[in-house]
């Protein structure tokens, strides 16, 4: 039990962190992961569950996101924080030997189709993160016509929400709590380093899901 493990879970449950807190070192530090997961993520979850009970919401979580304009702001902020981070943990994986971590399979095919090269793809993500003023997320998304692009969203917004209407393939948290302890104000260095721990197997799985038109509730498994 870490010093940060102090939240009880209610209705929607947490996605278990699929690696130890220090497993993403040296790219993401242990203390950041502890605080990020146990304070921020579980905090969003607790507040989301409170809001769901308060407003008597009985929809699957992605349906809530897709119809978020129906709900008060605390549902958007905390539900978005819950959904975004639940995906984010699975989109990362340890790389202890610091091997060259590059996309493969369907991820690489889509990157070449839509961005030309993996290097150019990374540059688009870096640029989007630099232009995202304040807190938010940078996403690689698939649209309903099968095309993909880079999207930046404010705060805890995500691609499922009505104004974006796309399917998240990869999401990177650019809130300061995701990187400040290790990188200080250098968001760009954080983004460049996080490519070392992207879980391309999970991204491939999400591309297959998107191609099968799974634009619905089955993202949390």
Question: What are the residue ranges of the model-derived segments?
Answer:
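Feature for soluble, non-membrane regions of globular proteins
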Residues: 2-221
């Amino acid at each position: 039990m870490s010093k940060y493990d102090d939240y009880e879970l209610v209705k929607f449950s947490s996605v278990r962190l699929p690696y130890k807190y220090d497993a993403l070192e040296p790219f993401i530090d242990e203390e950041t992961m502890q605080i990020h997961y146990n304070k921020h993520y579980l905090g969003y979850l607790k507040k989301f569950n409170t809001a769901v009970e308060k407003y008597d919401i009985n929809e699957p979580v992605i349906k809530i996101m897709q119809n978020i304009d129906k709900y008060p702001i605390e549902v958007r902020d905390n539900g978005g924080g819950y959904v975004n981070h639940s995906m984010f943990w699975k989109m990362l994986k340890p790389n202890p030997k610091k091997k060259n971590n590059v996309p493969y399979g369907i991820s690489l095919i889509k990157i070449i189709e839509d961005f030309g090269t993996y290097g150019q793809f990374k540059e688009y993500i870096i640029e989007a993160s630099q232009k995202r003023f304040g807190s938010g997320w940078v996403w690689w998304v698939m649209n309903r016509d099968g095309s993909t692009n880079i999207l930046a969203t404010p705060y805890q917004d995500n691609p499922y929400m009505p104004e974006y209407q796309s399917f998240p393939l990869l999401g990177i948290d650019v809130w300061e709590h995701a990187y400040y302890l290790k990188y200080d104000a250098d968001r760009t260095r954080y983004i460049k380093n996080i490519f070392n721990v992207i879980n391309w197997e999970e991204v491939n799985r999400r591309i297959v899901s998107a191609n099968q038109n799974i634009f619905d509730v089955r993202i949390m498994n």
